Every structure is written in structure tokens, then in C-alpha cells.
Amino acid sequence: ADTSGSMYWCSASPKPISVAFSLAIYFAERNSGDFKNHFITFSCNPQLVEIKGKDIYEKVKYCETFAECANTDIQAVFDLVLSTAVKNKTLPEDMPSKLYIISDMEFDYCAENSDVTNFEYAKEKFEQNGYALPKVVFWNVASRNMQSPVEMNEQGVTLVSGCNPRIFSMVTEDKCTPYEYMLDVLNQERYADIKA
């Protein structure tokens, strides 16, 4: 979950930071292995956080204690996932199959004057350590700029923007292609009377 300052600046409802923590808790509870009940905060010093609390209220309050209003270093997040796997000798098949980057997409660059994206850089580092970079869902919960963390047609990446139950269902059911989204919208009851 992006805990950088820009996640608090938006006047939208719900606030991007609230969405980020909610989704982080949801996905963390469904993780397995070394990442079970963990999520990563990210700004300049990302942390792998084990979620604590008896109920959703306690879990959210606990997660809020890790909010750091600083810059957003997405590369440090990829490095933390990789170093955790290496440290725990996680088998490749026990790695998370998908990473959800819940953010407003205002990331720092991974390297100055670099010709590679943060994603390409991470993919190479994972491969150097015997792992495949998990599929990545960049979920923009507060679009203010036209920033994109990957180039068009990048394999293994899904870009999602917005915050509503339909988008949540599509992401969790793994129906995130533009074509599937279009069909989902067009097949709604409100368009049933339209004939071609």
C-alpha cells in the first residue's frame, strides 16, 4: 500500500489511503507462505508488515501506524519482496503469483537517465536470483496525473484505475483485460434493449 504523502492530499471520497489500507488487508489475509497476513508499505523506506488485530477496526488502526508521508520508491518495494524471498529461501513455486501495487502512481525513478522502466528493472533482478517476477497489478486509486509505470503491452502487467465494487470484482476474479472489461459493461442489463 502506498503510504506516501500524495495519498492523503486528494479530496475524493473515499480517500486513496483508506482504499490502499483496505485492499492491503484484504489481499494480505489471502496470501500464503512467507507473505501470509503481510503487506508492504512503500515510500522511501518500505516495510513488510505483519497485520495484527482481532477485527477490521483494530487491523486498520494498526496499519495506519505504518503510514509514512514521504516519497514513493517502487523499486525498493520490488527489492524488499525479492530480499524476503532470498532470505527465507522461498521456493519459486511458493512466491506470490501476483503483486498488487495500490497507489496514485506517483513513483520515483529507479535509476537516473535509465532507458528501462521500474518494472523492467525489477524483472531482471528477480531473474538474476532465480525467480520470475510475479504478475503485477498497478491499481491507481487516485489518478491526478497521466503517469504509467509500464509501457504499452507489457506482459505480466495489468493497469487498473478507479475504485468501485465492479473494478474490485474484475481484479479479484482476474478479468482485467480491456476486452473483458468492455464486454462486462456492454452485457449489463441497462444495455439489453440495444440491438445492432
Language-model segments: which ranges?
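Acidic, glycine-rich A-domain
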Residues: 1-196
